[in-house]
Amino acid sequence: MKEKLIDRLTSYVVIDTQSDASSTTTPSTDKQWNLLNQLKQEIEQLGLETDIDEYGYLFATLPSNTNKDVPVIGLLAHVDTATDFTGTNVNPQIIQSYDGNDITLKSGLKIETAKFPELSLYKGHTLITTDGTTLLGADNKAGIAEIMTAIEYLIAHPEIKHGKIRFGFTPDEEIGRGPHKFDVERFACDFAYTIDGGRRGELQYESFNAAGVNVTFNGVNVHPGSAKDKMVNALNLAVRFQSSLPANEVPEHTEGYEGFFHLMELNGNVERAQLSYIIRDHSREQFEARKVKMHEIITSIQNEYGEQAAHIEINDQYYNMGEKITPHPQLIDIPLEVMKSLNIEPIVEPIRGGTDGSQLSYMGLPTPNLFTGGENYHGPYEYVSVDDMERAVMNIVGILQKFEEKA
């Protein structure tokens, strides 16, 4: 199985599939079609029917092999890779029996144990790394390889009973648009799992509540030599707004269930300044309070300088999927049971981010997130354990089998 996983993952990551937030199409980049079309061919070679729509949502079915009435379970992964670092000309490196020391990549870049102490978990494992010049794309191509390998394994082992399985590969997750054209009725599942986590054992069913914020300040630009009581400096208004937010409630000072305000971009001059933020919080109450806080600061500036001086636009992006998943405890209990049977220590923690499951859960498809075995996503230090990819496959198989047993 390890060789199949290596072959699949290395063939997927060399295909550049980065998404593009500035694009208005779906997929946002044509190059995502290259991997989608390859996957369609691979699925058909397994003897399964596939269908892909105009937006690049590739769905397929493994029929049930039991007479029981089993919930239809979906498996999902995304084909696009992050825009944080280049994904062009990925050159994966395979390290057999990792010795536990610093890893020197071809570029000379080092994955140092002092900076990345989790490397100690992988001594003796087969690792796949970058060459130091690109990201790897294990997020989420490791998940794709694991789904494909799990489906192939079930076909080869008909003695493992399971219900109807739907699986799919989707575009544009990394830019937050993965579910925007996702047809839940066409996917036709009771529940689903994204295979989009990281370290072995991760099981995630809580995500942030998320919003995007755009703030604009309009100043009055007057020659500084005669500006008294006339000039309104938009940059100073921007500074006032930012300094009115809690200084410690930012990504670099928060963890776990703690939320934050994150200033993403600042542009401006005396006449006009624009700030872009994201708001994140696991608590819906605190999430709403953060939005109120921003509105209150804007109102105070408007009261002093006029309504035209400040404008804020807040758009909710997604909500904590835990609200939709916890009413279905089997979605959590079954993976926990399977992991323990595989001697995998579960890591149940909130996602400090979002997955496609965050939006899909609110579209009527409760979708927790399972581990893939990867680390340090979105940059040149990214790597994945093939040993843990194999465990991820058996975790998927075990979950599907357990749903059938409990039906």
From Swiss-Prot:
Cofactor binding, note field: Binds 2 Zn(2+) ions per subunit.
Query: PROSITE patterns recorded for this chain?
Result: ARGE_DAPE_CPG2_1, ARGE_DAPE_CPG2_2
Which residues bind Zn(2+) 2 per the record? D139, E174, H378
**So what does this thing catalyse?**
Release of the N-terminal residue from a tripeptide
Subcellular localization(s) per the UniProt record? Cytoplasm
- Which Gene Ontology terms describe the biological processes this protein takes part in? peptide catabolic process; proteolysis
Q: What is an example of a GO molecular function annotated in this UniProt entry?
A: zinc ion binding
Give the family per the record: Belongs to the peptidase M20B family.
Q: Which GO terms describe its cellular component?
A: cytosol
Q: What is this protein called?
A: Peptidase T
Query: Lineage, please?
Result: Bacteria, Bacillati, Bacillota, Bacilli, Bacillales
User: Which CDD domains does the record match to this protein?
Assistant: M20_peptT (cd03892)
Indicate the residues that form the catalytic site. Answer: D80, E173 (proton acceptor)
One matching Pfam family is M20_dimer
List the cofactors.
Zn(2+)
Superkingdom? Bacteria
Q: What does this protein do?
A: Cleaves the N-terminal amino acid of tripeptides.
Per UniProt, the keywords (alphabetical) are: Aminopeptidase, Cytoplasm, Hydrolase, Metal-binding, Metalloprotease, Protease, Zinc
Whether Translocase counts among this entry's keywords is: no
| Enzyme Commission identifier(s) | 3.4.11.4
| Annotated residues for binding of Zn(2+) 1 | H78, D139, D196
